[in-house]
Amino acid sequence: MAVNVYSTSVTSDNLSRHDMLAWINESLQLNLTKIEQLCSGAAYCQFMDMLFPGSIALKKVKFQAKLEHEYIQNFKILQAGFKRMGVDKIIPVDKLVKGKFQDNFEFVQWFKKFFDANYDGKDYDPVAARQGQETAVAPSLVAPALNKPKKPLSSSSAAPQRPISTQRTAAAPKAGPGVVRKNPGVGNGDDEAAELMQQVNVLKLTVEDLEKERDFYFGKLRNIELICQENEGENDPVLQRIVDILYATDEGFVIPDEGGPQEEQEEY
């Protein structure tokens, strides 16, 4: 039977989005580029097969699933495996299959802890187990978003007393796996242009992922800030410590004034 894991709090042990994808791709020899691709449920099914051989009807898992009803079928297989191994976790299938970053990221963070608590280190050939199948990429994940308007970074109508510093959230985008290099000695200019466009699209998707992740965590910090402001008159030392951490900045960092040239420098 499985070792159940109930802690879902954010800790320093939680992996970042990039580290989580790297762990999944390395463990299952997949080529995922987005957390949202976990919405098919196929990766979780194979992880269960790795942890508890025979607990999942892996042959019934649709690794090439592209439609929501196929995702739901995969999660039903996962639920059956959970029940068979005594896993108490309730799978929020209706949320996961929508392919939203936040829901899928929270679930995979729990699953990573569950995996670590149950993995015994035995050898496992993921490609052979799934008979060479590769996961499909949903059309919405590969369509270039060249004309998609960007959401403003600050959309709150009520400005905080002191803005939360977000200078650490700007990360250099890295091209994810999946870009196929062609032999430079074969093909022509059209092939090179197509390859460059593919790389540009991958980078754009990576940037969008980073922006989603940034907004996700910034929203959590903003909620914490509002709670602190609502209770600031209580003189609670723990509350004051939280406020100090929220407003802490790196040495030498100056919060730019609203309006003026500084805002233009932040655009990219």
UniProtKB/Swiss-Prot annotation:
<feature type="region of interest" description="DCTN1-binding">
    <location>
        <begin position="208"/>
        <end position="268"/>
    </location>
</feature>
<dbReference type="GO" id="GO:0000132">
    <property type="term" value="P:establishment of mitotic spindle orientation"/>
</dbReference>
<dbReference type="GO" id="GO:0051315">
    <property type="term" value="P:attachment of mitotic spindle microtubules to kinetochore"/>
</dbReference>
<comment type="function">
    <text>Plus-end tracking protein (+TIP) that binds to the plus-end of microtubules and regulates the dynamics of the microtubule cytoskeleton. Recruits other +TIP proteins to microtubules by binding to a conserved Ser-X-Leu-Pro (SXLP) motif in their polypeptide chains. Promotes cytoplasmic microtubule nucleation and elongation. Involved in mitotic spindle positioning by stabilizing microtubules and promoting dynamic connection between astral microtubules and the cortex during mitotic chromosome segregation.</text>
</comment>
<dbReference type="Pfam" id="PF03271">
    <property type="entry name" value="EB1"/>
</dbReference>
<dbReference type="GO" id="GO:0005874">
    <property type="term" value="C:microtubule"/>
</dbReference>
<dbReference type="Pfam" id="PF00307">
    <property type="entry name" value="CH"/>
</dbReference>
<dbReference type="GO" id="GO:0005794">
    <property type="term" value="C:Golgi apparatus"/>
</dbReference>
<keyword id="KW-0007">Acetylation</keyword>
<feature type="region of interest" description="Interaction with APC">
    <location>
        <begin position="206"/>
        <end position="211"/>
    </location>
</feature>
<feature type="region of interest" description="Interaction with MTUS2/TIP150">
    <location>
        <begin position="124"/>
        <end position="268"/>
    </location>
</feature>
<dbReference type="InterPro" id="IPR027328">
    <property type="entry name" value="MAPRE"/>
</dbReference>
<dbReference type="GO" id="GO:0030981">
    <property type="term" value="C:cortical microtubule cytoskeleton"/>
</dbReference>
<feature type="region of interest" description="Interaction with CDK5RAP2">
    <location>
        <begin position="185"/>
        <end position="268"/>
    </location>
</feature>
<keyword id="KW-0597">Phosphoprotein</keyword>
<dbReference type="InterPro" id="IPR001715">
    <property type="entry name" value="CH_dom"/>
</dbReference>
<feature type="domain" description="Calponin-homology (CH)">
    <location>
        <begin position="14"/>
        <end position="116"/>
    </location>
</feature>
<dbReference type="GO" id="GO:0051010">
    <property type="term" value="F:microtubule plus-end binding"/>
</dbReference>
<keyword id="KW-0963">Cytoplasm</keyword>
<dbReference type="GO" id="GO:0051301">
    <property type="term" value="P:cell division"/>
</dbReference>
<dbReference type="GO" id="GO:0035372">
    <property type="term" value="P:protein localization to microtubule"/>
</dbReference>
<feature type="modified residue" description="Phosphotyrosine">
    <location>
        <position position="124"/>
    </location>
</feature>
<dbReference type="GO" id="GO:1902888">
    <property type="term" value="P:protein localization to astral microtubule"/>
</dbReference>
<comment type="subunit">
    <text>Homodimer. Heterodimer with MAPRE3. Interacts with DCTN1, DCTN2, TERF1 and dynein intermediate chain. Interaction with DIAPH1 and DIAPH2. Interacts (via C-terminal residues 206-211) with APC (via C-terminal residues 2674-2845); the interaction inhibits association with and bundling of F-actin. Interacts with CLASP2, DST, KIF2C and STIM1; probably required for their targeting to the growing microtubule plus ends. Interacts with MTUS2; interaction is direct and probably targets MTUS2 to microtubules.</text>
</comment>
<dbReference type="InterPro" id="IPR036872">
    <property type="entry name" value="CH_dom_sf"/>
</dbReference>
<feature type="modified residue" description="N6-acetyllysine">
    <location>
        <position position="220"/>
    </location>
</feature>
<feature type="modified residue" description="N-acetylalanine">
    <location>
        <position position="2"/>
    </location>
</feature>
<comment type="similarity">
    <text>Belongs to the MAPRE family.</text>
</comment>
<keyword id="KW-0132">Cell division</keyword>
<feature type="region of interest" description="APC-binding">
    <location>
        <begin position="220"/>
        <end position="242"/>
    </location>
</feature>
<keyword id="KW-0498">Mitosis</keyword>
<dbReference type="GO" id="GO:0097431">
    <property type="term" value="C:mitotic spindle pole"/>
</dbReference>
<feature type="modified residue" description="Phosphoserine">
    <location>
        <position position="155"/>
    </location>
</feature>
<keyword id="KW-0493">Microtubule</keyword>
<dbReference type="GO" id="GO:0031115">
    <property type="term" value="P:negative regulation of microtubule polymerization"/>
</dbReference>
<keyword id="KW-0131">Cell cycle</keyword>
<dbReference type="GO" id="GO:0005813">
    <property type="term" value="C:centrosome"/>
</dbReference>
<protein>
    <recommendedName>
        <fullName>Microtubule-associated protein RP/EB family member 1</fullName>
    </recommendedName>
</protein>
<dbReference type="InterPro" id="IPR004953">
    <property type="entry name" value="EB1_C"/>
</dbReference>
<feature type="modified residue" description="N6-crotonyllysine">
    <location>
        <position position="66"/>
    </location>
</feature>
<keyword id="KW-0333">Golgi apparatus</keyword>
<feature type="domain" description="EB1 C-terminal">
    <location>
        <begin position="185"/>
        <end position="255"/>
    </location>
</feature>
